[in-house]
């Protein structure tokens, strides 16, 4: 009996040693399955519990690292447009003879975009990292948000021979204007990446019943039906080679979904290959009386 017990103990020892090697080489799912009803089974259970803890900790570490990478990608993507605007207007001041009014206008754009950059960076930090901080929404005319975006993006799009037009009627919605402008910027920027030559992006806004509806339409290359349901997923790209060439982390539309959720808004995508894309944003419109109460 002692000989059999010793052999059994050696067998268990070898299995424990083998399991430890598996775990040390990254196989965190390896486990011992022993049902002997004695202290050896208890030892195996202790070892399995230890392996469970290691696997959980490693998974949590990987998840945390992935979230950090996503945040850095999102952050860089979101700050690109205001930074481009600031650099563009600063370059105008540096390289061209401008009138006093033009100089003041460019300086005001640089200042306002710098302040927006400061505000947006803090809000994105809350949105993407903290997530549990409540966003403060105030009554705002969505046409103002669109107009601000048009003023910032129009000069840069013109350099790429893309015309940006807008026709928005006045409304009143509960919103965080910085975050909502980020939503509009992301959608327009996504349209830009889908346009080859002689591009046109049109932004229209109007009140429909109890909603304010913003429609962003482009004449780009469009998307196949199977891609539409996936375009708001983080890191998903319709044309990965094009996206790498033009920059961006692939998180813009995923952020749009988060911002829309904060504003109780709905985003609908309609597209066809070769015919462009239409993005419809619908958000609650409050009455003017409520705005002045």
Q: Where are these predicted regions, by residue range?
A:
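Short alpha-helical segment of the dimerization/phosphotransfer core of two-component systems
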Residues: 112-117
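Membrane-proximal HAMP signal-relay module
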Residues: 5-9, 13-72, 87-94, 129, ...
């Amino acid at each position: 009996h002692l000989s059999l017990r010793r052999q059994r103990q050696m067998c268990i020892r070898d299995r424990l040693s083998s399991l430890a090697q598996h775990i040390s080489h990254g196989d965190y799912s390896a486990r011992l399955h022993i049902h002997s009803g004695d202290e050896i089974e208890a030892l195996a259970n202790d070892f399995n519990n230890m392996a469970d803890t290691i696997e959980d900790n490693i998974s949590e570490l990987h998840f945390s690292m992935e979230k950090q990478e996503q945040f850095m990608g999102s952050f860089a993507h979101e700050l690109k447009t205001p930074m481009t605007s600031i650099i563009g207007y600063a370059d105008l001041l540096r390289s061209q003879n401008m009138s006093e009014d033009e100089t003041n206008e460019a300086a005001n754009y640089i200042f306002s975009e710098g302040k927006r950059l400061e505000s947006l960076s803090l809000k994105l930090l809350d949105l993407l990292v903290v997530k549990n901080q409540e966003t403060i929404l105030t009554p705002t005319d969505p046409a103002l948000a669109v107009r601000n975006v048009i003023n910032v993006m129009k000069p840069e799009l013109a350099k790429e021979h893309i015309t940006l037009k807008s026709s928005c009627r006045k409304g009143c919605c509960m919103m965080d204007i910085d975050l909502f402008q980020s939503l509009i910027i992301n959608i327009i920027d996504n349209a830009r990446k889908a346009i080859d030559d002689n591009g046109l992006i049109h932004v229209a806004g109007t009140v429909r019943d109890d909603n304010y509806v913003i429609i962003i339409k482009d004449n780009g290359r469009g998307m196949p039906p199977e891609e539409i349901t996936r375009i708001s997923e983080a890191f998903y790209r319709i044309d990965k080679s094009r996206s790498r060439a033009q920059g961006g982390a692939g998180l813009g539309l995923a952020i749009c979904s988060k911002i829309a959720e904060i504003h109780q808004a709905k985003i609908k995508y309609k597209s066809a290959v070769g015919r462009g894309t239409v993005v419809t944003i619908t958000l609650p419109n409050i009455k003017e009386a409520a705005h002045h109460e």
